[in-house]
Amino acid sequence: MRIRVSYLLVLCFTLIWFRWTVVYSSFSDLDALLKLKESMKGAKAKHHALEDWKFSTSLSAHCSFSGVTCDQNLRVVALNVTLVPLFGHLPPEIGLLEKLENLTISMNNLTDQLPSDLASLTSLKVLNISHNLFSGQFPGNITVGMTELEALDAYDNSFSGPLPEEIVKLEKLKYLHLAGNYFSGTIPESYSEFQSLEFLGLNANSLTGRVPESLAKLKTLKELHLGYSNAYEGGIPPAFGSMENLRLLEMANCNLTGEIPPSLGNLTKLHSLFVQMNNLTGTIPPELSSMMSLMSLDLSINDLTGEIPESFSKLKNLTLMNFFQNKFRGSLPSFIGDLPNLETLQVWENNFSFVLPHNLGGNGRFLYFDVTKNHLTGLIPPDLCKSGRLKTFIITDNFFRGPIPKGIGECRSLTKIRVANNFLDGPVPPGVFQLPSVTITELSNNRLNGELPSVISGESLGTLTLSNNLFTGKIPAAMKNLRALQSLSLDANEFIGEIPGGVFEIPMLTKVNISGNNLTGPIPTTITHRASLTAVDLSRNNLAGEVPKGMKNLMDLSILNLSRNEISGPVPDEIRFMTSLTTLDLSSNNFTGTVPTGGQFLVFNYDKTFAGNPNLCFPHRASCPSVLYDSLRKTRAKTARVRAIVIGIALATAVLLVAVTVHVVRKRRLHRAQAWKLTAFQRLEIKAEDVVECLKEENIIGKGGAGIVYRGSMPNGTDVAIKRLVGQGSGRNDYGFRAEIETLGKIRHRNIMRLLGYVSNKDTNLLLYEYMPNGSLGEWLHGAKGGHLRWEMRYKIAVEAARGLCYMHHDCSPLIIHRDVKSNNILLDADFEAHVADFGLAKFLYDPGASQSMSSIAGSYGYIAPEYAYTLKVDEKSDVYSFGVVLLELIIGRKPVGEFGDGVDIVGWVNKTMSELSQPSDTALVLAVVDPRLSGYPLTSVIHMFNIAMMCVKEMGPARPTMREVVHMLTNPPQSNTSTQDLINL
């Protein structure tokens, strides 16, 4: 009896203890989760993030939290918190979840170092911390006790230092992804000791040294990613040919040299080989044809030579062949047309010659076809779009002849048609002008002929280029149906008739070139309604009538060419208000009257802009040739005696006019010093007449909507930059101008171009600046010298320009908003120190007395913040956006507009590029966009500036940093090894 009672007591005690243990453990996990929520959310997290994670007295409440899975004992065994997003850090309390088997906290914004308490999670099978901002060295020691770990994913973080070696001892580890970080040094030899590894990702780091041949010992490995931004020495290890289970080998963009090892042909299970963007040489080994499973082969952007091996006809599974930008030669083998699964063939920029295989595309699978810049001849294969799925058809810069195949006009899947610079002839299939998805149709520089179809449509077409062909007939009125069209080029053809007014009703149209045709009739009045226009060229036609009234509505127009027509009437006075117009050509027409003066007319060279108009009078000239000519013509009807008298009077008058002119010129020179007044903001040993004498055509160093800039060499040996302002200013009598310019003259900062003074008379204002002998940043980035501007210099210029803007926004009195930040307004002195220029002028250049208006000038195309479109206001965050565009220019080396397709600016292009990456990360994106002219740059530094740039160009102004914050970020880059081991050599 006593034994039974004792047994019951022990049983009750055990049950109570177990129940207490469950309760304690349950509440312990609840407390840990609540601590995690508090730490991981961060200040920037949205209110609803993890909102269901709340305290409760229920033992199982935490098991119903989003992303939480419990076992039968109410212990947390899985935590999956993905894409919340979170902005805090991972706290030490994570170690309390000791039964955790799966920790997945990917795609958030968690920062700081990983806590050492992770070492307590000895039951972990999956640790996924990818797509966060964790930093510091990866603490490999935390994995020592994780003997069950099968997958470790730390992709796309900010870990630095050497690769962790402790993880090699994890016998069950199958998946290791450390790509997209800042790991440096060499790949440890010990990485060949993994026993079960199937996936190894070390790409997109800063690794150097040789790729260890010993990695070939990883016999279970199926995927090996080693490329992208790593900078190895040597080439592909031949021993890799023994990795019999390998399915994917990626070693792209990692500075590989040497030849492709023939031993890779032994990888019979390999389906993808990516070795593009390296320095590989030699020919393609025929042995690669033994890779019977191969589907994707990318050898692009190397220095490979020779021909495509005939043995590649065995590769029946090939879907992708990227061979572009090499030195391959010979013909494209006929077997390529027989590959049953081929979808992508891109071989542009090689030396391929002869004809294309006639059956190319006959497999019914083609998606992408690009053979640009080769020496290919013959006819275009007729079945390229047999699949009905072809997206790109690009054969530019070859020697193709014959017609465009009818099938291209029926290929509704196409997005790009580019056949320029060939010898194509015959009419264009009408369907080409009705494809719904095409964004660019480029047929220029061929011998295409016939009339354009009367039915034209295409809801996606943004660029239509038919230049330099033999097209005839009228321009179809249906052209107006192209509602997405931004650029229209019909120049150098044989079009006749009038320009359809509907052309200028296309809502997004920015560029029109219809020059060099046989067009007649007037310029359509609808042109004045298309405010989006930036360039119009109607020259070399037979257009007549007057220039339509209302041209001043085209405030974004920068180029207008109406030369070599029969246009008559006066030169429109309203052109003076077209402040963006920097190129105007009205030469060789029948304009009459007097050329207007002032405003934007000060930008133009009269002798070139208005040449060849015999009845046009120029201002400030002694006589008007047309008037004198008409007078003489009428006198011919009179008697010889009267004619002689008139001629005598005319000659006497001419002599008198010459004498008067000489007298006036001498008088003007005598009184020039009295007509101009110099106001100096520091001691200047120059006179007003010294400045005025420099206003000569040969001294012009720049033109823009704000005025003309001259280089002035003063008698004392100093050089100054003289800016002649264009606008409605009233010279020295404009007291608003004087007050504001004198305020600007007091600004002193080493990174702001100093205003030395100004010279004015009653009509004109001349601003005097320090002369910057090295020109503008824009000239260095986008001119011939761009490749010589190394990364260190670019970063230095960014810091200095940021400091100048920061001073204007935060420390200047009064505070100044620049309103036209761009690379051309960042000037470089003799020591290449950056100086911000043209600050604060926009608010009074065009509207004297309205200097409080913040919307009189929005900036320059490509730099304008998006909010201007609906607020018509600018503030300091608008400057920040523009500066972000400048930072992108420094990184990418391309202009903000004009190089990414019509209607796409540099910000939109970067975002589009990011969306197209298969594995998006800062590293991958930077490598995809970085200026190819740069060599040997520290990747960490480029990524750091790129991240700052993307913060600056955020769509909403309040989300952008201040310039003070920008300076702080630029001057405090992340700590990294900046030795040559951290350099990427492209």
Swiss-Prot record:
The GO terms describing molecular function are:
ATP binding; protein serine kinase activity; protein serine/threonine kinase activity; receptor serine/threonine kinase binding
| Consequence of gene loss (knockout) | Increased number of root nodules when inoculated with Mesorhizobium loti. Inhibition of shoot and root growth. Increase in arbuscular mycorrhizal (AM) fungus colonization intensity in roots (enhanced mycorrhizal phenotype) when inoculated with AM fungi.
Provide the free-text tissue specificity comment from this protein's UniProt record. Answer: Expressed in roots, leaves, stems and flowers.
- Keywords tagged on the record: ATP-binding, Cell membrane, Differentiation, Glycoprotein, Growth regulation, Kinase, Leucine-rich repeat, Membrane, Nucleotide-binding, Receptor, Repeat, Serine/threonine-protein kinase, Signal, Transferase, Transmembrane, Transmembrane helix
Quick one: signal sequence residues?
1-25
- The main location is membrane
- What's the protein name? Leucine-rich repeat receptor-like kinase protein HAR1
- Protein's organism: Lotus japonicus
Gene behind this protein: HAR1
